[in-house]
Amino acid sequence: MTAITITDAAHDYLADLLEKQNTPGIGIRVFITQPGTQYAETCIAYCKPGEEKPEDKAIGLKSFTAWIDGFSEAFLDDAVVDYATDRMGGQLTIKAPNAKVPMVNADSPINERINYYLQTEINPGLASHGGQVTLIDVVEEEAKNIAVLQFGGGCQGCGQADVTLKEGIERTLLERIPELSGVRDVTDHTQKENAYY
């Protein structure tokens, strides 16, 4: 069973909205865009019969069906959909505390593990300089996995980017991901207008 809670108030509010659609069997679909990243957004959309995806999980509610996106399901653990009334009318809220938490382990694909460490360990440090690094690709060269990275923000054009790449980023990633052999920077560092150093 999916660990998402739809309160009675939210159920009644959504049931009223769905009834106004004049579409027999219409329900809702709950999903997260970019789950497991800092950009994760939890969404609820109308779901007409046949619009659900094969991997979706159906939750039969009192007045309608809620379809939970299969890929988002783990990120929706402990999520709560609620409706709170106020003097302006009311507001539907979705609290999904695990939406931005990456779900990776030693068996996860290498690109997911690289992104996880970039988001949780590398980028928080680079953010203090207004910078970030993103994974462009993982390429195999001479039977070795190389992470192709690109700097942005204050790191692009920074005179310390090469030191950061080798001493910080590469060292951290190689410690955490044994099958990774190195990193390569594909940033155009001639663009220096936002550079930290």
From Swiss-Prot:
Keywords: 4Fe-4S, Iron, Iron-sulfur, Metal-binding. Homodimer. GO terms for molecular function: 4 iron, 4 sulfur cluster binding; iron ion binding. Transmembrane segments: none annotated. Coiled coil: none annotated. SUPFAM superfamilies: Fe-S cluster assembly (FSCA) domain-like, HesB-like domain. InterPro entries: Fe/S_biogenesis_protein_NfuA (IPR017726), FeS_biogenesis (IPR000361), FSCA_dom_sf (IPR034904), HesB-like_dom_sf (IPR035903), NIF_FeS_clus_asmbl_NifU_C (IPR001075). Belongs to the NfuA family. HAMAP family: Fe_S_biogen_NfuA. [4Fe-4S] cluster binds at residues 155, 158. Its cofactor is [4Fe-4S] cluster. Involved in iron-sulfur cluster biogenesis. Binds a 4Fe-4S cluster, can transfer this cluster to apoproteins, and thereby intervenes in the maturation of Fe/S proteins. Could also act as a scaffold/chaperone for damaged Fe/S proteins. Binds 1 [4Fe-4S] cluster per subunit. The cluster is presumably bound at the interface of two monomers. This is Fe/S biogenesis protein NfuA. The keyword Phosphoprotein does not apply. GO terms for biological process: iron-sulfur cluster assembly; protein maturation.
